[in-house]
A protein has these predicted regions:
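Short, small-residue-biased leader/transition segments that mark boundaries at the very start
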Residues: 2-9
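Metal-dependent amide/peptide-bond hydrolase catalytic core
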Residues: 104-230
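Contiguous hydrophobic segments
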Residues: 10, 77-82, 86, 168-175
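Histidine/acidic-residue-rich, glycine-tolerant segments that coordinate divalent metal ions
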Residues: 5, 14-145, 225-229
């Protein structure tokens, strides 16, 4: 694979130059992102097995100028969660809406009200993203479906903000179930926590990057990203 080839090149370079003190371990992370391979590696003892004291990683970003490095101390990338909402109503013929419990109308209300978590429930000083990314319902023009499905992602830097989102989602989903007289189920999946850099390691990484690209190509206080990594 491309990643495997890159690791081999780095290994050969480090072996041939050896212009550093100490040891370097090159880690290939399986199941990157979706399955959380980073956490599994730590749980299985990779850091203890090879006596790894610090971990450095590079995240490629296509919109960053070639050769430029961005980093910062503290939280730099957000934590990423997923949510799934199932709206269960009563389907029926589109000509007789009074005989149905329309999940689409309820789903629209839920999606609109979810937007108020950021605009009305959150402290404006706290960073938060709540994005609805999928809505699915129905398969034909003249039938009210029984189900509607809403999926999306939440990005936070703070656990208290994460818990606020969960609380408000539960209230919104429950409230719409009562309002429309149908069933709504929320499944909230906590994903990767925020990426947090220690100040000492940021200094080390920034100095190394300056040796490669020059002082003007390194920003060691770049600002936070709402993207996430495991």
């Amino acid at each position: 694979s491309l990643v495997g080839s890159e690791m081999c090149i780095r290994d050969r370079y480090l072996s041939e130059t050896r212009n550093f003190a100490g040891r370097v371990a090159l880690i290939f992370q399986p199941a990157e992102e979706n399955e959380g391979g980073g956490r599994i590696m730590v749980e299985e003892g990779i850091l203890d097995r090879f006596d790894i004291k610090n971990v450095y990683a590079i995240h490629n970003t296509p919109d960053v100028e070639l050769g430029k490095f961005y980093t910062m101390p503290g939280p730099i990338m957000a934590g990423a969660d997923k949510f799934h909402i199932d709206v269960v109503g009563v389907g029926g013929h589109g000509a007789y809406p009074h005989e149905t419990k329309d999940p689409i109308t309820a789903a629209i209300g839920i999606v609109q009200t979810l937007q108020t978590i950021v605009s009305r429930s959150r402290d404006p000083n706290d960073k938060l993203v709540v994005s609805v990314t999928q809505i699915h319902a129905g398969s034909t023009d003249n039938v009210t479906p029984q189900n509607a499905y809403i999926n999306g992602t939440v990005r936070t830097f703070d656990k208290k903000v994460q818990e606020l989102v969960i609380k408000r989602m539960e209230e919104i989903v429950s409230g719409h179930a009562q309002t429309f007289g149908l069933e709504c189920k929320l499944r909230y999946e906590k994903g990767y926590p925020p990426t947090i850099n220690s100040p000492e390691n940021v200094k080390t990484a920034a100095l190394a990057a300056e040796d490669i690209s020059g002082v003007n190509m390194v920003d060691d206080n770049a600002g936070q990203e709402m993207g996430a990594e495991d």
